[in-house]
């Protein structure tokens, strides 16, 4: 037996030590942090599946990725992303997490806040957290989930109507992380009595710079940037004005992430809306589709109608931008309420997932497989036990929505980080009308199929409270 010599202490220069610490910090920062609040890894989440699935020869995906690379490397141009869905999107936590991550990655490219809607101007209607809305006067709410909406609807799928009295809707920006001041406001809406809205800020009412009656746009070019303002609707007895959306822009290049969501909305509900004019205003480069949880809520889920209704929306978008890229988000795992405190797993989740892959194949889009990533069938119960999903086993908590937003962002970042080919591959252009043999035997039925009512989730149309 022998004694080991005592090693001499190694003295590391301070500069080298700092460099090593910096390197270690960089390596640590590249580790996925699914929940920005807790940084916790969950054993039931399939992190290895967190990616976008698409054909690398897709023209729309190639062009979007090239445009993203060009804008983010040169600082010139704009990228417009629309995120469409139901209550998962209206609540705002999920899309805002994706938006926050994208803009934080490119702080010099803060584009306009984009399309918003004053949801809480109406009673019992929830608003995203990054802006507050107040309206003292009573307004009538119209949503695309209604069987026959009384008032016209646009891309937002929701409207508020002022009637008989002057109405003031206050929009207060509460986002402190980004400069969302705007110099360009577009009020979307119409009045059969010729009511013209105004914008009020710093104690004065400003009329529109110009009015486009064909597209129902009232455009305001402001002399100074504002982050909060009032929408003034000067109605008198017997007069109405229906507000269908508000678009906030600026003159800076950058990224705009528009979230469009209506509680309880299914795919056919958006077919009740006039989409084209508002789409021409935004001209999206990418649309993230998160509609489907309400379509698949009932036992009699019609996958053919689900696919064809989705294709009808895709056709409308492609009529505005023929090479708009699509990401189809598969439904989250969910349960169906069967009685008091009793739930049964919703087996339609895998069926909706298959349709999303079919849609991506037809349109040249991508799939973000939320269903697979979160753990597959019956995984929602595990999310609930961890405080990530609500008791209804359909909606997430705030922590859950933030986690989902982080995961989607990370999947997108993986694509952004890939080197672009020196020469663009021969693209597979998305066909405006897929061949008959691609559609199976459905013969492209685009009749609007309402979501099931008798067997649907009773909570799907309710205002989803999202606890911390």
Feature names for model-found ranges:
Residues 1-39, 456-468:
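Bacterial Sec-dependent N-terminal signal peptides
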Residues 31, 75-77, 88:
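Terminal targeting/pro-maturation regions of precursor/exported proteins
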Residues 38-83:
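Membrane/wall-proximal cationic-aromatic binding patches
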Residues 58, 77-83, 90, 94, ...:
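Conserved, compact domain cores that house catalytic/ligand-binding motifs in diverse enzymes
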Residues 67-70, 101, 173-174, 277-278, ...:
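A generic secondary-structure signal
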Residues 83-85, 110, 117, 329:
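Active-site neighborhood of phospho(di)ester-bond hydrolases with catalytic His/Asp-centered motifs
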Residues 90-200, 205, 209-308, 395, ...:
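Conserved SGNH/GDSL esterase-like catalytic core that processes O-acyl groups on lipids
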Residues 263, 272, 333-449, 461-467:
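Catalytic His-Asp segment of secreted/periplasmic serine-dependent ester chemistry enzymes
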């Amino acid at each position: 037996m022998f004694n080991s010599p005592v090693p001499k202490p190694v003295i590391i220069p301070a500069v080298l030590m700092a460099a090593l610490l910096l390197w270690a910090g960089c390596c640590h920062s590249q580790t996925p942090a699914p929940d920005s609040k807790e940084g916790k890894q969950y054993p039931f989440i399939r992190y290895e599946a967190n990616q976008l699935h698409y054909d690398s020869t897709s023209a729309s995906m190639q062009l979007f990725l090239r445009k993203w690379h060009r804008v983010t490397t040169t600082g010139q141009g704009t990228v417009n992303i629309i995120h469409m869905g139901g209550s998962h999107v209206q609540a705002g936590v999920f899309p805002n997490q994706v938006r926050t991550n994208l803009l934080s990655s490119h702080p010099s490219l803060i584009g306009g806040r984009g399309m918003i809607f004053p949801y809480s101007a109406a009673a019992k209607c929830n608003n995203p957290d990054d802006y507050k809305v107040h309206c003292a006067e009573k307004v009538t709410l119209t949503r695309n989930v209604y069987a026959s909406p009384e008032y016209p609807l646009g891309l937002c799928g929701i409207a508020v109507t002022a009637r008989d009295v002057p109405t003031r809707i206050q929009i207060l920006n509460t986002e402190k992380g980004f400069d969302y001041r705007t110099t360009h406001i577009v009020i979307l809406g119409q009045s059969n009595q010729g009511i013209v809205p105004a914008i009020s800020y710093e104690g004065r009412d400003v009329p529109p710079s110009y009015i486009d009656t064909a597209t129902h746009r009232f455009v305001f070019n402001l002399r100074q940037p504002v982050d909060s303002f009032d929408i003034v609707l000067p109605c008198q007895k017997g007069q109405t004005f229906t507000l269908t959306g508000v678009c906030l822009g600026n003159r800076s290049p950058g990224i705009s992430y528009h979230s469009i969501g209506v509680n309880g909305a299914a795919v056919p509900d958006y077919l009740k809306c006039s989409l084209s004019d508002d789409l021409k205003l935004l001209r999206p480069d990418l649309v993230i589709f998160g509609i489907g949880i309400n379509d698949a809520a009932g036992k009699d889920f019609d996958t053919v109608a689900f696919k064809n209704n989705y294709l009808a929306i895709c056709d409308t978008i492609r009529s505005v931008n023929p090479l708009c890229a699509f990401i189809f988000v598969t439904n989250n795992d969910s349960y169906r309420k069967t009685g008091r405190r009793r739930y049964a797993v919703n087996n339609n989740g895998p069926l909706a997932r298959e349709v999303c892959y079919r849609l991506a194949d037809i349109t040249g889009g991508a799939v973000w497989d939320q269903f697979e990533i979160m753990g597959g069938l019956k995984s929602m119960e595990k999310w609930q036990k961890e405080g990530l999903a609500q008791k209804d086993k359909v909606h997430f908590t705030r922590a859950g929505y933030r986690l989902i937003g982080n995961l989607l962002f990370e999947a997108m970042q993986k694509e952004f980080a890939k080197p672009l080919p020196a020469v663009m591959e021969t693209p597979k252009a998305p066909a405006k009308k897929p061949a008959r043999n691609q559609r199976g035997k459905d013969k492209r039925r685009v009749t609007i199929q309402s979501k099931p009512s008798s067997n649907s989730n009773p909570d799907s149309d309710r205002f989803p409270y999202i606890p911390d």
